[in-house]
Every structure is written in structure tokens, then in C-alpha cells.
A protein has these predicted regions:
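N-terminal auxiliary segments of SAM/dcSAM-dependent transferases
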Residues: 1-67
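Conserved class I S-adenosyl-L-methionine
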Residues: 104-113
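Conserved SAM-binding loop of SAM-dependent methyltransferases across substrates and taxa
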Residues: 114-126
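Conserved SAM-binding motif I beta-strand of class I
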Residues: 130-135
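S-adenosyl-L-methionine
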Residues: 136-172, 176
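A short, conserved alpha-helix within the catalytic core of class I
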Residues: 184-190
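C-terminal substrate-binding/active-site "lid" region of AdoMet-derived donor-dependent transferases
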Residues: 190-193, 197-249
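Conserved small/polar residues in nucleotide/adenosyl-binding loops
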Residues: 253-255
Length: 255
């Protein structure tokens, strides 16, 4: 195994690490030399983790053990510092899939939020694609960019425009448009001008009334075909040797 391959399996300064305790509680940290992580389980000296293998166990000064792994994007999204309402991992996967975000695509995104959806889109378009984000609230940019850069350090293919997507889109021949805005029906006309023939528009909204208004606006515009409204449900299960039953929480998404 070469040195590059070896380093991929070792924690380095600046890496994100996910600590998991015996009760499967999770703690997201950034590794830094000569730093100490404090929690209710005790102190953990981060120098002990740097240079060691991912997937190792570490003991705090109180005797508690923690498993350290690389966080998935879903882990980071659940733990990320938040401003506006966040889109969770179950929704991100559906959005990328149903919008058919592909490597090399040029994607317009309406709304930046905490940066979770932007990060997922950047991953999906790859180095040869581009994400152009329209955000009206300048105050969300610093926190969102910190989140995005922790997941996708190379943001050279991300362009953020401080502007109102309801007022129109200047770009043309766009492959995909993904909206996470309160009133997506207000953006329909401008998106119709921007999308390439055969392009896809997807809007994520939390209520069925918003779905109805959006669909009616698409139909009235007349340039959009194959309009679909989707609701997906995600339920986790509690599985033991003695019983199998669904968990009590159920998650919904409207597209």
C-alpha cells in the first residue's frame, strides 16, 4: 500500500471525526493538534487520534470509550450548525435522485439555507459541473459557506449570487433547477426561460398547500410537462432477537 492510500486511513489535523459512545450517541469534532475535546464522558486528547487509524476506540480520562470514524455527509448534516430550516439526509437523497443531478450538470439552486442541499448538489455534479445559487439573505452566507467547505473543501465550481430568484434568472441553457424557497410558484416564469429543453425543475416544500400552488403555476405557464407531485415517507425499525417493530417517528417529504 502506498503512502497516499495509507494516509486515507489515518486521521489528520483538520479532519472531521465522528465519535460514537456505547449508547450510540454521536459527537462531531474537528481534529486539531494539542487540543482537548470535553464532553460529559470526560476529556479526550486529540493528539492521541491524529495519525491513528480510522475506526479505532479511544478512552476518555473518565474511562469511557468512544469509537472514532469519518462522518458521512448525513452525519455532518444532522450535526451541522444551523440557521434556517435544514434539509435532512433522507430528503437530500430524494432530491438528488428525482432531479436527476448528474456529473457535469449545471444546476441553479434557489435558497442557500445552512448549505446542506448545496453540498449534496456539489457532490453530485462533480468537478466538471457547476452549482449557481441564488440567495436573497446575505446574513446566511458566512455560516452556510463554513458548512459547505467542511463537506466539500473545493468550492471552485460554486457561484453564489446575492439576489431574488423570484425576479428572474440571467443564465440560459441550465440543466436542472432545484428550489428550497417559501413560494416557488413565483419563480416559475424565470425558470422556464433558463432551463434547457428537456431540463428538470424540482421544488422542495414542507406542506401540500405549497405543492398545489406550485403545480397550478406550472400548468398555467404552459412550458412544463410531466408534472409530478411526490410524498416520500421514511420509517426506521427497531430490530432485536425478541421483536421487530417500527419506530414511533415517521418522516415526510413533499416534492
Amino acid at each position: 500500500m502506498n503512502q497516499t492510500q495509507t494516509n486515507k486511513n489515518l486521521f489528520q489535523p483538520g479532519d472531521l471525526a465522528l465519535l460514537i459512545d456505547r449508547k450510540e450517541r454521536r459527537y462531531l469534532i474537528t481534529l486539531a493538534e494539542d487540543e482537548i475535546y470535553h464532553c460529559h464522558l470526560g476529556r479526550l486528547f486529540l493528539n492521541d487520534m491524529i495519525g491513528s487509524s480510522i475506526g479505532s476506540w479511544y478512552r476518555t480520562d473518565k474511562g469511557h470509550v468512544l469509537l472514532a470514524v469519518r462522518p458521512t455527509m448525513g452525519d455532518f448534516v444532522r450535526q451541522m450548525p444551523r440557521g434556517p430550516q435544514i434539509i435532512y439526509p433522507k430528503d437530500l437523497g430524494n432530491i438528488v435522485n428525482f432531479a436527476d443531478i448528474f456529473p457535469g450538470a449545471t444546476v441553479i439552486e434557489g435558497g442557500l439555507g445552512s448549505g446542506a442541499l448545496t453540498s449534496a448538489l456539489l457532490r453530485a455534479v462533480g468537478n466538471t459541473g457547476k452549482v449557481i445559487n441564488y440567495e436573497i439573505d446575505e446574513s446566511v452566507l458566512p455560516k452556510a459557506m463554513r458548512n459547505i467547505e467542511r463537506v466539500t473543501p473545493d468550492t471552485s465550481n460554486l457561484e453564489i449570487k446575492l439576489g431574488d430568484i423570484y425576479q428572474g434568472i440571467t443564465e440560459r441553457d441550465i440543466d436542472r433547477v432545484v428550489l428550497d424557497v417559501p413560494e416557488p410558484w413565483q419563480a416559475v416564469s424565470g425558470i422556464g426561460d433558463a432551463l434547457v429543453m428537456g431540463g428538470i425543475l424540482l421544488s422542495f416544500v414542507p406542506t401540500i398547500i405549497q405543492v398545489q400552488r406550485f403545480v397550478l403555476a406550472l400548468e398555467k405557464d404552459g412550458r412544463f410537462q410531466m408534472i409530478e407531485s411526490l410524498e416520500t415517507m421514511l420509517r426506521t425499525w427497531h430490530v432485536t432477537e425478541r421483536s421487530v417493530r417500527p419506530d414511533h417517528r415517521l418522516s415526510l417529504i413533499h416534492i
